[in-house]
From Swiss-Prot:
Record-given protein name: Phosphomethylpyrimidine synthase
Keyword annotations of the record: 4Fe-4S, Iron, Iron-sulfur, Lyase, Metal-binding, S-adenosyl-L-methionine, Thiamine biosynthesis, Zinc
Subunit relationships: Homodimer.
Reactions accelerated catalytically: 5-amino-1-(5-phospho-beta-D-ribosyl)imidazole + S-adenosyl-L-methionine = 4-amino-2-methyl-5-(phosphooxymethyl)pyrimidine + CO + 5'-deoxyadenosine + formate + L-methionine + 3 H(+)
Pfam family membership, one: ThiC-associated
EC numbers, comma separated: 4.1.99.17
Origin superkingdom: Bacteria
Length: 614
């Protein structure tokens, strides 16, 4: 057993070392808050001096949002078998409204805990979970509605601003006006604004009290657009060590949250390893695991099995649950004439259960019971779109919009319990129908954050659906979607590997950033301006480092111009030394400046008179 456990830990440690090197040209910094234990991580990109030819000025570092946790900090020693430091434990405990349990509440969790066959894969550094005291509500929404600004709220306010107040270069602050479609975009994010947005339900701060390792992050259309990356093992592919690696890899490249969609062996144990080593919010779809417990027979599912699964996962520290409570019995026939029917796994499970029993969805009928569980651990609802369109032909149909209306009804119930709630959206939608989705969601769901899978704007590009969906994601992000669920090149084809995860995240970081630019989010253009200046001044290393993927940028440049001298060249391999448009522009500027100098000298030689008599 010890040998097996050691092998797993060693494998995970080796994997972590391959993905934890510092991001080129950057260093981890921590911006202090109002208390010593509130240190907000960011990434500072150092820039070189502008060459003398272009004025010879210093270029201040650029601060950017960072999701990578301690993994990219060379000063931190990573031990995956111990997990990350419990950053928020003191904040949770000092509120005095939770208690440490004497044992696990879930019967399934207790069975796994005492099964010796699982010793080889069990996370070794486990601690007992916390739960709200009797009668208490421990959600960030509950605190916000009572006028309390929590350390988590201050943390995200500092994080969202990205040290914008420290920028002194007016050129970097230059920005086109945005079109926010009614959003309340602020010039500076304050803790009070964060509190107010959470209290209104327009933003969520997913932070389970049993995930103290997480660095607080906010999701809402008045904040930076966030992205989610999916990972998870299946019955036929992928193991625990690989999933931990994918977690670290996903957050390295910019995943704001990660959903563990495991459906295969050791779901419970895999999730524990992931949560204990995750600085970002973790989401799940509990119905997947509940289905495993009944050997994949949807009709055998019961409320009791599902309830036990919710408690099991809440006590592990899952931050948000996708719950398909809007798939109602009366909506199922509306999908019969669709081209692709019901494509959501969770949606199809609940539809099958409804038809098998000819009863209403038990997630819907027990929704208030679910709320009681959510508010005892501060788990955020992600109300699932189980009837989302699976092709553009099915977009915006009666089934999809009927479910959306029900999700609006459920949102109001969740808010009655002060449970944080976001709404999941499509799917496959052609570009001309995207805004209708956003407008209807805002109207039906009271501006609760929208969380969309793309949408994919065409169905003809298997192998390239990270592109087809990033197009729709950029658009719907501009219109108001708060978080975008990434799509990888393997969508519809297979389980993504590490490179697929990277490609999907990059496509979605581009989409999210484009949306922030279009909305006019303050400071969104700073990085663009800094990179453009570096590009014009042929500061190649700065160009690489300011990019979303510095390693890829350098790799592509060095394929054709690999020598160190080429990092100082005033051209690239695209146009060569004689046809570089930026070099030509600089030559024109120099010519114009020299011409102006000659005219100035002639003016002074003529007596410096404005007018001359003929």
């Amino acid at each position: 057993m010890n040998a097996q456990l050691s092998a797993l830990q060693q494998q995970a440690q080796q994997l972590s070392e391959s993905v934890t090197r510092p991001i080129p040209g950057s260093r981890k910094i921590h911006v202090p808050g109002s208390r010593p234990d509130l240190q907000v991580p960011m990434r500072e990109i150092a820039l070189t001096r502008t060459p003398t030819l272009f004025g010879g000025e210093e270029n201040a570092p650029v601060t950017v949002y960072d999701t990578s946790g301690p993994y990219t900090d060379p000063e931190v020693r990573i031990d995956l078998s111990a997990g990350l430091p419990a950053l928020r434990r003191g904040w949770v405990e000092e509120r005095g409204d939770t208690e440490r349990l004497e044992g696990l509440s879930s019967s399934f969790g207790r069975d796994r805990e005492h099964d010796p066959k699982l010793d080889a894969v069990r996370f070794p550094a486990r601690s007992l979970p916390r739960r709200a005291r009797a009668g208490a509500n421990v959600t960030q929404m509950h605190y916000a509605r009572r006028g309390i600004i929590t350390p988590e709220m201050e943390f995200v306010a500092i994080r969202e601003n990205q040290r914008l107040e420290a920028i002194r270069d007016a050129g970097l602050l230059q920005q086109h006006p945005g079109e926010a479609f009614g959003a309340s975009i602020q010039k500076i994010i304050t803790p009070e604004f964060v509190r107010d947005e959470i209290a209104r339900g327009r933003a969520v701060l997913p932070n389970n009290i049993n995930h103290p390792e997480s660095e607080p992050m906010i999701i809402g259309r008045n904040f930076l657009t966030k992205i989610n990356a999916n990972i998870g093992n299946s019955a036929v592919s992928s193991g625990i060590a690989e999933e931990v690696e994918k977690l670290v890899w996903a957050i390295r490249w910019g995943g704001d949250t990660v959903m563990d969609l495991s459906t295969g062996k050791h779901i419970h144990e895999t999730r524990e390893w992931i949560i204990r080593n995750s600085p970002v919010a973790i989401g799940t779809v509990p119905i997947y695991q509940a289905l495993e417990k009944v050997d994949g027979r949807a009709e055998a599912l019961t409320w009791e099995i599902f309830r036990d699964t919710l408690i099991e996962q809440a006590e592990q520290g899952v931050d948000y649950f996708t719950i398909h409570a809007g798939v109602l019995l009366r909506y199922v026939p509306l999908t019969a004439k669709r081209v692709t029917g019901i494509v959501s796994r969770g949606g199809s499970i609940m539809a099958k259960w409804c038809l098998a029993h000819h009863k209403e969805n038990f997630l819907y009928t027990h929704f208030e019971d679910i709320c009681e569980i959510m508010k005892a651990y501060d788990v955020t609802f992600s109300l699932g779109d189980g009837l989302r369109p699976g092709c553009i032909a099915d977009a915006n149909d009666a089934a999809q919009f009927g479910e959306l209306e029900t999700l609006g009804e459920l949102t109001k119930i969740a808010w009655k319990h002060d449970v944080q709630t976001m709404i999941e959206g499509p799917g496959h939608v052609p570009m001309q129908l995207i805004k209708e989705n956003m407008d209807k969601q805002l109207r039906e769901c009271g501006e609760a954050p929208f969380y969309t899978l793309g949408p994919l704007t065409t169905d003809i590009a298997p192998g390239y659906d990270h592109i087809t969906s990033a197009i729709g994601a950029a658009m719907i992000g501009w219109f108001g979607t708060a978080m975008l669920c990434y799509v990888t090149p393997k969508e519809h084809l297979g389980l993504p590997n590490r490179q697929d995860v990277r490609d999907g995240i990059m496509a979605y970081r581009i989409a999210a950033h484009a949306a922030d630019l279009a909305k006019g989010h303050p400071g969104a253009q700073v990085r663009d301006n800094a990179l453009s200046k570096a590009r014009f001044e042929f500061r190649w290393e700065d160009q690489f480092h300011l990019g979303l993927d510095p390693e890829k940028a350098k790799e592509f440049h060095d394929e054709t111009l690999p020598k160190d001298a080429h990092k100082l060249a005033h051209f690239c391999s695209m146009c060569g030394p004689h046809f570089c448009s930026m070099k030509i522009t600089q030559d024109v500027r120099e010519y114009a400046e020299s011409g102006m100098k000659e005219r100035s000298e002639a003016f002074r030689a003529a007596g410096a008179e404005v007018y001359h008599q003929g």
